[in-house]
């Protein structure tokens, strides 16, 4: 959510930043709506003040036996009492109209974010490692998983429809091992506190992190309302419950940075991805992810962003996976983001659009959101000046467990179709070194 006062003071800068995202200028329309709102509030307050003053004057007129004046004042007060609820409602409608307009506008990109219309405008930041070489043609994860008998899309479709999978035996265990490994590193070495959050959240929580109202079609609604009339939603990412833990609160600066992590199922309708990645586990309605969330001060949020990226990278390094980090351009970064790094892991079995073997696939996005989400959540901290200020929020995948499973399968595949277990995962697998078909 944007600060309308900042927009009033900086209309040209606001429109220029929107232009970098490929959007039309909106400052003038927002300022005009805000002027209407402020005018309605001022008129209501003036009428309220006049009612109070006239009520006081009635007593004075009666005391002075000025009956005609007292009658006129009582008539005026009666008229104001009738008008005031209407004026208050009009002011509140304009307040809500402005809020709705602001809620539809994405965050403003930082100055250093590269400009571009889509993913083709993203800029490579750095690369880690080299792709492995194989004495055979690497298979994709679907062929590997089905060959082992541990990955079943057909039975999943009978249960739940398209974009679901049933994992079993060695692959189910491997996915669990990856998630536990990620959590152990982030909590044991990176200073994140593990949280086990609800998987159902209310409208307010989804609004706070900016999934609602703009991306309603991409979410799974639970189809029921709570006692206050709010809807329930399956979480699309643990970012939602973790970030909303500080909603409507004022933290002490000593509590910051607050670093939280969770391993949860995530649920996405993928309405905007129809026809994309329909084969395999790349894009699922249900998947597992380790999420990283940081709540910090404005002065520290940029440093925290770099730190979060390094934490996400570290777990991939220990898995021995080759990847690259991309700085997303203005046309490709998320709605709530000021700046985003994507980590794209190399998957040797994937076939690119050019028909070549091997391609990079996103496995993590790390974003700094400034105070954009904090304003929607009313999340603040009290600094040395003893005044409340909005916190800055950051979120990142640490990382997507399903895609990490794919990367491990394709990277560590052997010619006979078995999967070598990375050294760091073997303790989580009871010492198992190779995943083979059950005999």
Curated annotation (Swiss-Prot):
Where does the chain bind L-serine?
237-239, 291, 397
The broad enzyme category this protein falls into is: ligase
Q: What does this protein do?
A: Catalyzes the attachment of serine to tRNA(Ser). Is also able to aminoacylate tRNA(Sec) with serine, to form the misacylated tRNA L-seryl-tRNA(Sec), which will be further converted into selenocysteinyl-tRNA(Sec).
**MF-aspect GO terms:** ATP binding; serine-tRNA ligase activity
What's the Enzyme Commission number for this chain? 6.1.1.11
So which domain of life are we looking at? Answer: Bacteria
Which family does the record claim for this protein? Belongs to the class-II aminoacyl-tRNA synthetase family. Type-1 seryl-tRNA synthetase subfamily.
* Main localization, broad class: cytoplasm
Q: Which gene encodes it?
A: serS
Q: So, what pathway does this thing act in?
A: Aminoacyl-tRNA biosynthesis; selenocysteinyl-tRNA(Sec) biosynthesis; L-seryl-tRNA(Sec) from L-serine and tRNA(Sec): step 1/1
Q: What is this protein called in UniProt?
A: Serine--tRNA ligase
Among SUPFAM superfamilies, the record links this protein to: Class II aaRS and biotin synthetases (SSF55681), tRNA-binding arm (SSF46589)
Task: Quote the PROSITE patterns the UniProt record gives.
Answer: AA_TRNA_LIGASE_II (PS50862)
């Amino acid at each position: 959510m944007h600060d309308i006062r900042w927009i009033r003071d900086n209309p040209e800068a606001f429109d220029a930043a929107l232009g970098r995202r490929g959007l039309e200028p909106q400052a003038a329309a927002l300022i005009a709506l805000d002027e209407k709102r402020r005018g309605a509030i001022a008129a209501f307050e003036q009428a309220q003040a006049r009612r109070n003053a006239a009520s006081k004057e009635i007593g004075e007129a009666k005391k002075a036996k000025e009956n005609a004046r007292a009658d006129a004042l009582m008539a005026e007060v009666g008229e104001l009492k009738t008008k005031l609820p209407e004026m208050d409602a009009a002011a509140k409608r304009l307040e809500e109209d402005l809020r709705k307009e602001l809620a539809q506008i994405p965050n403003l990109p930082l100055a250093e974010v590269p400009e571009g219309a889509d993913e083709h405008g993203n800029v490579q930041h750095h690369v880690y490692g080299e792709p492995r070489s194989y004495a055979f043609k690497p298979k994709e994860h679907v062929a590997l998983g089905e060959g082992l008998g541990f990955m079943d899309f057909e039975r999943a479709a009978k249960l739940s429809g398209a974009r679901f999978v049933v994992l079993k035996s060695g692959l189910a265990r491997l996915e669990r091992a990856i998630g536990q490994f990620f959590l152990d590193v982030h909590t044991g070495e990176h200073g994140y506190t593990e949280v086990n959050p609800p998987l159902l959240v209310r409208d307010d929580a989804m609004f706070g992190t900016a999934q609602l109202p703009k991306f309603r079609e991409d979410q799974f609604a639970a189809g029921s309302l709570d006692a206050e009339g709010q809807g329930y939603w399956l979480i699309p990412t643990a970012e939602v419950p973790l970030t909303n833990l500080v909603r409507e609160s004022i933290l002490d600066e000593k509590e910051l940075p607050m670093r939280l992590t969770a391993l949860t199922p995530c649920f996405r309708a993928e309405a905007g991805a129809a026809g994309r990645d329909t084969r395999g586990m790349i894009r699922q309605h249900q998947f597992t992810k380790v999420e990283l969330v940081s709540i910090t001060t404005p002065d520290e949020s940029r440093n925290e962003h770099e730190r979060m990226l390094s934490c996400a990278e570290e777990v991939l390094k220990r898995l021995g996976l080759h990847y690259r980090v991309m700085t997303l351009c203005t046309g490709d970064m998320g709605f709530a983001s000021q700046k985003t790094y994507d980590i794209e892991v190399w998957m040797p079995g994937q076939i690119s659009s050019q028909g070549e073997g091997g391609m990079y696939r996103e496995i993590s996005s790390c974003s700094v959101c400034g105070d954009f989400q904090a304003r929607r959540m009313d999340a603040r901290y009290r600094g040395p000046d003893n005044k409340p200020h909005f916190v800055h929020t950051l979120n990142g995948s640490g990382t997507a467990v399903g895609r990490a499973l794919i990367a491990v399968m394709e990277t560590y595949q052997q010619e006979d179709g078995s999967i070598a277990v990375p050294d760091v995962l073997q303790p989580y697998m009871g010492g198992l070194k190779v995943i083979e078909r059950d005999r």
